[in-house]
C-alpha cells in the first residue's frame, strides 16, 4: 500500500541528500515533492538544480522555467538557471539572468555575486 507522504518530510529528506551530494536520492524525493506541491517554486528550483548536477540539462531547464513561471523574481532560480546556461555554453542567456539579478539586488546579493563569479570563471577558461 502507498502511505501518505508528508511533503515537508520529503523536502527535508531531499535537502539532506543534497548536502551529502546524493543527487539520485534527492531527485526521487524532489520528484515526489513537486507532485505533491506543484506550485512551490523553490521545490522546482531544487529539482532542477539536482537534475543539473546529474547533467540532465534539458529536464533541468524545463524545471527552472516552471520555477520562474511561478515566481519570476526567484533569485535562487535565476542564479542556478544562469549557471545552467554557462554549463551549456550559452553565456548570453547567463548574462540576461545576471542583469535580472542586478535589477532585483541593486546593492548586491549572494545570488548575483555567485552567478557573476561563475560567468567570470567560465570566461577566463575560454581565454
Regions found by a protein language model. Give the residues of each.
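Terminal, low-structured helical/coil segments at or just beyond the last alpha-helical repeat
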Residues: 1-7, 95-127
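Structural marker of alpha-solenoid helical repeat scaffolds
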Residues: 36, 70, 103-107
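Canonical tetratricopeptide repeat
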Residues: 46, 80, 114-118
Amino acid at each position: 500500500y502507498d502511505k501518505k507522504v508528508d511533503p515537508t518530510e520529503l523536502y527535508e529528506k531531499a535537502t539532506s541528500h543534497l548536502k551529502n551530494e546524493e543527487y539520485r536520492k534527492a531527485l526521487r524525493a524532489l520528484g515526489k515533492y513537486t507532485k505533491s506541491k506543484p506550485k512551490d517554486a523553490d521545490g522546482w528550483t531544487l529539482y532542477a538544480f539536482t537534475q543539473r548536477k546529474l547533467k540532465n540539462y534539458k529536464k533541468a531547464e524545463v524545471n527552472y522555467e516552471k520555477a520562474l513561471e511561478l515566481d519570476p523574481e526567484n533569485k535562487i532560480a535565476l542564479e542556478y538557471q544562469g549557471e545552467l546556461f554557462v554549463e551549456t555554453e550559452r553565456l548570453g542567456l547567463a548574462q540576461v539572468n545576471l542583469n535580472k539579478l542586478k535589477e532585483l539586488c541593486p546593492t548586491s546579493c549572494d545570488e548575483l555575486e555567485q552567478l557573476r563569479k561563475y560567468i567570470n570563471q567560465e570566461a577566463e577558461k575560454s581565454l
